[in-house]
Structure formats: structure tokens, C-alpha cells
Regions:
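Secretory targeting and sorting signals
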Residues: 1-20
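Short, surface-exposed polybasic-aromatic patches that bind anionic ligands, especially phosphate groups
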Residues: 21-313
């Protein structure tokens, strides 16, 4: 579809959406349908520490901040295939990194700023490779840490292991993508940061990097937008995101600015769309309790039940 036609879809009538959207340029679905990233949390109980966590995140006086937008602001990802050369990477945190090799090269996009994330999806194997503090280094690649994920699996990283994110979670599954907004539905939670995290993690997170302040949320904490939030004044495209925030919510995945949520680099994002998302107040979110949904400690799979009420359809 021509970019102008896609923009017309976002600006006007949104097309019906399938239950999942493959990574653009691949046939790879991002995790199975019973993965926690894709859990509908709209009916889950409110977490008993919801108000405390929101207080530490300054929710009362803060609005959401889209950490992406035009012209090239956000997190890159690259699609590769079996023809791309694989390399070994020298890791700072090798004991908590997957050894690889990685399809990383001088052609790989690296996120700007201090985190320098590099995300690569192998379209032939549906494998996600992620690096933190990635540096090509003249053909002697280095990174702070690295993680490899089978996009067809619910397996989590070993407990206590970091990833390219402080929470030990994958980054790509939590990024807002333009193709999803244009299709009319987002079927997963979105990655969010906060300045203050407690030095602990809860499912599905696997790693902590916080403080001893128990008022702060742990890595893996999940927040959903209240069902009563009025989206009538927002554009059709912004309402797609609002619906996802009500249904799938936000997962605390890293330390950073309060209520910053991430998306991919895409030249089709517009300032008007991003500015609308900045009007969503953080006080309209609630932390949810996912403990009743977990199938097993080392799995990202969820199972509906009395303690995990999931809407049908």
C-alpha cells in the first residue's frame, strides 16, 4: 500500500484487524496467543499496591509520553534472513547474555541515546535478537548484554537474568508499531518506563535494577487504562491505542522517565497523533494483579480461570 493510502486509513476509517499482526517484512507472529504480552487484562483485579505504585510514579500530575514519533524518533528493528552474516559479540554482562552468534553488522540500525539498543528479527527462523549498548566497533562487535527469543515460544529467560532491557524482557513485543495502528488493533501490552523501580521483579519480568524504596513498582508491574476513560475526543488512530491501553495495558520494562512508552521508528508517525497521546493522564491507570494467570514460573503463558478472568471474543 502506498504510504499516503496508509495515512488515510489512520486518519479516517480504520480497517478490521486480525487477532495478531506479524512483524512487518516477515510472517512471524510475536509469541503465541496465550502469551502474557497478549493477555487481555481489562477484567483482572486491581493490584493491592496500585495507589502506592502510582504515587511513586507521580501519576497524579503526569501524562503519558510517547517516546517515539517523527521524523526518526523511537526504537529501530531490522529484518534479516539466513543470508545475513552472524557474528560473536563481546558482552560486558556475559554471564546473563545469550552467547549467540547474532545477525549484527555495520548495516544494523542502533537506537540513539545512551541505551543503543539493536533489534534484529530473522524472518526465516522467527528468532528475535536484541542487544543493549550495541557497538559495531569496526568489526569487533561489543554490547552490554544480549538476548535471543524464539517468537513461537512462551519460554522466559532464566530468573535473575537481564536482557537488552532491565526487566529481562524482550523489547520488540512491547513496541507500538505503525502497521498495528493502521490495521485498527494492537493485540499486546506496551513497554513503559518509570524513574523509580523497586529492586525486585514480578512475572513476567526476570530481572531487577531498582532501589530499596518499596513504594516503587517492581519490574514487570502492569497497568491498564480505566474502562471509563472517555476517548470520544480523540482521533480514530489514537482510539486504537487507547483501546489497547484498556485491554492490554503497559508493562514496566526499564528505568527511565515516568510514564514514557515506546514505539518503533517509522516515518509515517505524525506530530498530531503523538500529541494526542500526550493528553492521556497517568492518574487514569490502575495496576492489575496478574498472579492468577501464570501457568508456570518459567513460562510466559497464561491460562484463564477464576483468578484470571479474561473476556471471551
Amino acid at each position: 500500500m502506498h504510504p499516503a493510502a496508509v495515512l488515510a486509513v489512520v486518519a479516517g476509517v480504520l480497517s478490521p484487524a486480525a487477532s495478531a499482526h506479524p512483524v512487518p517484512g516477515t510472517g512471524c507472529e510475536v509469541f503465541p496467543s496465550d502469551n502474557v504480552w497478549r493477555l487481555d487484562v481489562s477484567k483482572l483485579p486491581v493490584h493491592p499496591r496500585s495507589d502506592t505504585w502510582k504515587g511513586a510514579m507521580h501519576a497524579r500530575h503526569t501524562r503519558l509520553h510517547p517516546d517515539f514519533g517523527p521524523p526518526s524518533y523511537g526504537i529501530w528493528f531490522d529484518v534479516v534472513d539466513a543470508a545475513h552474516a552472524d557474528v560473536s559479540v563481546d558482552f560486558t554482562y556475559a554471564s546473563e547474555s545469550d552467547p549467540g552468534p547474532y545477525p549484527f553488522g555495520s548495516d544494523t540500525h542502533i537506537e540513539g541515546g545512551s541505551d543503543r539498543h539493536a533489534l534484529m528479527v530473522d524472518a526465516d527462523t522467527c528468532t528475535l535478537y536484541e542487544l543493549y549498548d550495541a557497538r559495531w566497533n569496526g568489526g569487533n562487535p561489543k554490547a552490554g548484554s544480549g538476548a535471543i527469543f524464539d517468537l513461537g515460544s512462551n519460554a522466559l529467560r532464566p530468573a535473575g537474568w537481564t536482557s537488552a532491557d532491565a526487566a529481562g524482557l524482550p523489547i520488540l513485543p512491547g513496541l507500538l508499531r505503525y502497521d498495528e495502528v493502521a490495521a485498527g488493533a494492537i493485540d499486546h501490552a506496551i513497554r513503559v518506563t518509570t524513574d523509580c523501580t523497586y529492586d525486585d521483579f514480578i512475572w513476567p519480568a526476570r530481572h531487577a535494577a531498582g532501589t530499596t524504596d518499596r513504594r516503587c513498582p517492581p519490574m514487570g508491574a502492569r497497568f491498564r487504562l480505566r474502562a471509563s476513560f472517555d476517548a470520544s475526543g480523540f482521533s480514530p488512530a489514537a482510539r486504537v491505542v487507547i483501546k489497547a491501553l484498556k485491554r492490554h495495558g503497559l508493562i514496566v520494562a526499564d528505568n527511565g522517565s515516568d510514564w514514557y512508552f515506546q514505539g518503533t521508528v517509522d516515518p509515517r508517525w505524525t506530530y498530531s497523533f503523538v500529541d494526542q497521546l500526550k493528553q492521556i493522564p497517568a492518574r487514569s491507570f490502575l495496576a492489575v494483579d496478574e498472579r492468577g494467570c501464570r501457568v508456570a514460573p518459567d513460562s510466559g503463558a497464561f491460562a484463564p480461570g477464576p483468578d484470571c478472568p479474561v473476556p471471551s471474543g
